[in-house]
UniProtKB/Swiss-Prot annotation:
One of its GO terms (cellular component) is ribonucleoprotein complex. This is Translation machinery-associated protein 22. GO terms for molecular function: mRNA binding; translation initiation factor activity. Residues 104-175 form the SUI1 domain. Keywords: Cytoplasm, Ribonucleoprotein, Ribosomal protein. It comes from the Eukaryota. Transmembrane segments: none annotated. The SUI1 domain may be involved in RNA binding.
Length: 201
């Protein structure tokens, strides 16, 4: 009888692990406690993966994790966790307050007689990338649109033509992070007339 060769039982290829990532802080849930958004991370995990939540955050799991610590270390860990949570809440409140106060200015500017451009400033406060928004404006209104630097140090989007009302509607419709109340329409021509009237009077 002929010998039949048996394949050698060598090392198999390593298998990939499936890792769950937190929807709030984007870390694996086991590491959420080191970030500043622990409470939000816990809520997210409880809604999306109850089994993992019970394994990490159940009272039994927490007690087992802190059992080896001394009383002083437990108190210190608790104090640190409260401090981190308070700091994260304060940062979030500050960011929300900043967004409330931020204003997007859509200004119609007269260049020559009956020729206008529309400038849009303040969108970067809402986390929008100006180059992408300028490209969207150009596509939507079939006109030239570019990001330019302002003398005060910031940047604005300049769109060819008088499209200020349409831009306001487009921003409200497409970019939900920008509240309609925070968009201000300004007509530069009227301002020039007012300045001329006050100078003459």
């Amino acid at each position: 009888m002929a010998d039949v060769e048996q394949p050698e039982a060598g090392p198999s290829e390593p298998q990939g692990r499936e890792v769950t990532y937190c929807g709030v802080c984007s870390l694996p849930p086991e590491y959420c406690e080191y970030g500043g958004t622990v409470k939000k991370c816990q809520d997210w995990l409880q809604r999306n993966n109850q089994e993992m939540y019970d394994r990490i955050w159940s009272p039994e799991a927490l007690q087992a994790a802190t059992a080896a610590l001394s009383v002083e270390a437990q108190q210190r860990a608790e104090k640190d966790a409260k401090k981190k949570a308070a700091k994260a809440e304060a940062a979030e409140a500050k960011h929300a307050d900043k967004l409330k106060k931020s204003v997007v200015t859509v200004k119609r500017i007269e260049r020559n007689k009956r020729k206008y451009v529309t400038s849009v400033s303040g969108l970067e406060s809402f986390g929008l990338e100006l180059k992408k928004v300028a490209k969207d404006f150009g596509k939507k209104f079939a006109t030239g649109s570019s990001v330019t630097k302002v003398a005060s140090g910031g940047e604005e989007i300049v769109v060819q033509g008088d499209v200020s009302d349409e831009i306001k509607e487009f921003i409200v419709e497409k970019y939900k992070d920008v509240p309609e109340d925070n968009i201000e329409l300004v007509d530069d021509k009227k301002n020039k007339k007012k300045e001329a009237a006050t100078a003459a009077g």
